[in-house]
Amino acid sequence: GVPINVSCTGSPQCIKPCKDAGMRFGKCMNRKCHCTPK
């Protein structure tokens, strides 16, 4: 995944930030969102 500068405690929190970044839903790793490129 592609790390973005968004803090998280769970993967559901990353859905919108990843979409806003123009990518697909990713997951929360090391308290940061990691998105899946399209």
UniProtKB/Swiss-Prot annotation:
InterPro entries listed in its UniProt record: Scorpion_toxin-like_sf, Scorpion_toxinS_K_inh
Protein name in the entry: Potassium channel toxin alpha-KTx 3.2
A Gene Ontology term for the protein's cellular component: extracellular region
Comment text on domains: Has the structural arrangement of an alpha-helix connected to a beta-sheet by disulfide bonds (CSalpha/beta).
Naturally occurring in which organism (per UniProt): Leiurus hebraeus
SUPFAM superfamilies in the cross-refs: Scorpion toxin-like (SSF57095)
Disulfide bonds listed in the record: C8-C28, C14-C33, C18-C35
Gene3D superfamilies found in the cross-reference section: Knottin, scorpion toxin-like
Predominant localisation class: secreted
Pfam families: Toxin_2
